[in-house]
Amino acid sequence: MAAVHARIASIFLVFASIMQPASSESGAGVSDALPSALNIAPLAMPDFSFAGYGFGLAPIPTESGKVIDVTHHGVISNDGKDDAKAILKALAAADLVRGLVTIRFPKGRIQIGEIIPVERSDIILDGAGEKDGGTEFYFPRPLKIVDTSDRENELRDYLKREEKFQVEPDQNISFLFSEYSWSGGFILIGPKKSRAASYLAEYDKQDTVLTQAVSGRQFDRQLIVANISRLRVGQIIQLQWSANAGENSSILKSLYGDISGWNEKQTDPKMKLNIGLRHWESAKRPTVAQSTRIIAIKGNTVTLGDPLLHAVSAVQPALLAAWKHLSNVGIQNIRFTFPYSPWFGHHLEQGYNAIYMTGIFDGWARNLVIENADSGILTDNAASLTIANITTTGNHKAHYSVHIGAVHNVLVRDLRIENPVIHPLSVNTRSTRSVYQRATVLCDGIIDQHSGSNHQNLFDQIVMNVKPKKRDDVWSYALWVGGGAPYWKPGHGRMNTHWNIRLNFDADAAKGTTVRVTSGLEGPGAWIVGLHGNRSLEVDYKPDAYVEGTNAAIAAAPSLYDYQLAKRRKRP
C-alpha cells in the first residue's frame, strides 16, 4: 500500500508539470482527445455515474399514486392567510394511505409560517410549476422566530461548547454562530425523531451492527462478509469504516494517501497538511460511511449497488450497519419565496432555509426556484438523491445555494445560481462520491471543499463568472476557497475531481495576459482536468494535484458523469 501511495504522489508531480498545453492569450482551445486521466494506472478514477436516484440509471418516477389535494384540507392560495395548518392536515391524511401518495398544491401563493415535516416514505410534494403563474410557497418569517422545537438542541450545545463565534473586529461582530447557518429547513424531510447530523459524542449511539465486512477491493462491488443471516437482497445498509487506531489508522491512509512528501518540502508550518482529531475521536461514529443497497447475495459474498469507496481487509476493517431512512420522497414544480432581508454576516443567518433533506435513500428535488434564501437546499445523512433544475435567485446574500453535506451519491444537475452566495458549490463534511454537474454560477464563483473527510466528489462541466484581482502586475483568481475547522482538516481527501470547468472573466479584466488560478491549502490527490476560460490560465493548487489539459475544453467527454454513465449502460 505504501508503494502504491508513493507512486501516486510521483504521478501527480509529473503530470502537474507536463500536462498543461500551451495556449493563446485569448483563452481556451478545444481538445478532441480523451484526457489521459481516464487511463492512468494504478489510479483508477472513481466511477461517479452511480450518483443520483437509482444509482444514476433509474428514471425519477412519474406516477402519482393516491393524490391528495391540499385545497380539500383548507389551503386557499392568494388569500394572504397562513396555510401551514391546512398543509399539515393534508400530510396527516397522507399518513393513512398505504403506498405512493402525492400532495398536490394549486397555483398561486401559499403562505407557510411554520416547519412542515415530511416523515414518511413514498410521498411527493407536487406543485403546478415553478415559473410565474405556478405554485409559490411564501415564508414571511425565518426559522429563528418560528422554530420552537428541540430539533437543533445538539447543534446549539455544540456551538456553545466549541465557542463557535463569528469574529470580525472591523465590523464590530463577535456573535455565536446561528444554528440555522447549515442546518434546518421549512420543508424538513427525514424520519421522525432522527438525528440529521452528529456533533457531540454524548449523543452518539452505536448503530445496529448487521455483520462484519471481511474483504473487498476498492471500487469493486463485491464484498465478503462474516455472516449473512441478517442480510437480504434489496436491503439498504450502511457500510462503515472507522479510524479505530487513531491517526495511524489504515482508513486515513486510504483517504489521504502519503502526505509526508508534501510536508517535508514545506518551510512554513502553516502549509503542512495535518489530519484533524475529529476523524477518530468518537468510537461510535464512523470516519467514512457508504449507504447503499444489497443487490445480490451468494454464499458470503454480497454484491452492492455501487462500488466500494475503500478497500476492506483485516488492517482496514469495516462493518455493515442498519440505517434509519425514508425512500422514494420527492418535491417538485414549486417556487420558494422569502422576503428580502439584510445580510447580518457569515454564520449569522436567521434561517430562511427552504428545504432540508435528511435520512433519505432514493429521493429527489427538481424544477424549483428559490428566492432570497439563506440556504436553498441543505442535505445530510442521505444517499442516492437527484437534485435537478434548481435556480436560486434574489438579492439577499446566501450561505449555501444547494449544499452537499454528509451524503453519498448525490447528483446536483443543472443548478443555476443567480444570487450572491458565500459557498456557491460546496462539498461538506463526510460528503462522498457526489456530483455537481453543469452548474452555472453567475457571480463570484468559487469551489468550497469544506474539510471533514469529504472525498471522491466531482465538479463536472461547471461554468462560473469570476472577477480576478491584480497585484504586483500579476492577475490571479482564488477559485478553490475551502472552509471547515482545523479539527476536520485537510480540506478534502483523495480523488476530488474538477472536470472541464470554464471560467468567464469580466470583459476588461486581465485582457491579453495569463490569470493564475489559485487555491488555499486544500487537500491531497485532487484531479484538475480541462480547466479553461476566456483568458489563458495557469493552475496553482496546493498541495500537489494532478493537472491536465489546462486551457482546452474537453470535447471528447464534456461531462465526466455522462461519459462514465454511457460506458455503464453499454456493459452487459
Describe the residue ranges of each PLM region:
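Extracellular beta-strand solenoid repeats
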Residues: 104, 111, 117, 126, ...
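Glycine-rich beta-solenoid repeat tracts in large extracellular/virion proteins
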Residues: 115-119, 135-146, 178-180, 185-192, ...
